[in-house]
């Protein structure tokens, strides 16, 4: 069994402090073993190692104003960048993201639908774009859902719930809605809707989450998110 030295985990410093105890847990060791075994066998995983903790690196703990939870990274080549629903510039925006843009256009008529899917601008404003599983095997959706990432992201959500206040949690689809149990609804705003995927029948359009999130932030003395990317 390998060991994980918490000091050597490359993640943004404020998150390292908050999640420090998680890095020595058995489940975290299991994650590292799984990724090392995949590499040894020539199995490709996404995102690249340097982007696994990109959501945390882009949005420090004390900067988080909103959280958008995804299931796991995109499993196609060049898509995953460590931010839920986001793809790098130059990669065609996936259908779920196009529906997110449609809802933004409905809520904010001045919103200009971009020709890219890079949501880094949201992350820099305090939107934690968190996938519940932080890695995936190429071409196999959900393949790393049971290797330990769930425990890690549960810990991150609980830390935000317990140590911060007035954060907007946007939970889309049944998988994300299950995370509500880790969030104190008296301290935070929990918004739920169907998943933005076209497979959900388009019912995501009209949820008004982006406007409601900003209304909540403004009501609690915070700068609203500029959703334009």
Swiss-Prot record:
This is Uracil-DNA glycosylase. Keywords: Cytoplasm, DNA damage, DNA repair, Hydrolase. Pfam families: UDG. One of its GO terms (cellular component) is cytoplasm. It catalyses: Hydrolyzes single-stranded DNA or mismatched double-stranded DNA and polynucleotides, releasing free uracil. Belongs to the uracil-DNA glycosylase (UDG) superfamily. UNG family. Excises uracil residues from the DNA which can arise as a result of misincorporation of dUMP residues by DNA polymerase or due to deamination of cytosine. The keyword Hydrolase applies. InterPro entries: UDG_fam1 (IPR002043), Ura-DNA_Glyclase_AS (IPR018085), Uracil-DNA_glycosylase-like (IPR005122), Uracil-DNA_glycosylase-like_sf (IPR036895). SUPFAM superfamilies: Uracil-DNA glycosylase-like. GO terms for molecular function: uracil DNA N-glycosylase activity. Its EC number is 3.2.2.27. One of its GO terms (biological process) is base-excision repair, AP site formation via deaminated base removal. The active site is at 72 (proton acceptor). PROSITE patterns: U_DNA_GLYCOSYLASE (PS00130). The lineage of its organism: Bacteria, Pseudomonadati, Pseudomonadota, Gammaproteobacteria, Cardiobacteriales. The gene is ung. It is found in: Cytoplasm.
